[in-house]
Amino acid sequence: VNSGVLAYSEDASTPAELTIQGGKVETSANGANGVFAYGSSTINLENATVTTTGEGGSGGIMVAGGGTLYAKDCNVTTEGGSSAAIRSDRGSGLMVVDGGTYIANGSKGTGPPAIYCVADITVSNATMQAGNAQALCFEGRNPAHIYNSYLEGNYTASDDDENCNVMVYQSMSGDAAEGTSYCTM
């Protein structure tokens, strides 16, 4: 698993827990996430700056495989294609974000959303922007809860696709459970 910071445990009887207060996390490799909670792990991230510049899924803060991540007052910026600022993937998880700025600046065509939702994600009191993509993308049966926040997307179709700022889809890769996604704002 390629990340600047990773908390990982496969065994619920020996969970991993990591707390980071302040500091900077920077990654530049393709596919390198900034801060990633996987499996039976929990990350508490507060007042930190996270920057990723690699292509191909270099998310800012991420959960997968059932991981849990709490982010408070962080500044997260991603520059690569398919690199959401708030990212989740196969196996779901829980992410709770309170305050801060989360910006995804990937290039047009592969631009990442501000939030890529394959987990239970709650965001409050935050600013989220996608420079060249939908603001929010749901894959499969997953909820997003957004309160007292600013969420902006900038997706414009390059072919016959519809212009939209929220995308909901079900991939056939098995990354996400089938069912209904929903968003509360």
Language-model features: locations:
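Surface-exposed loop/turn motifs in large extracellular/passenger domains
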Residues: V1-S28, F36-G54, I61-S82, R87-K108, ...
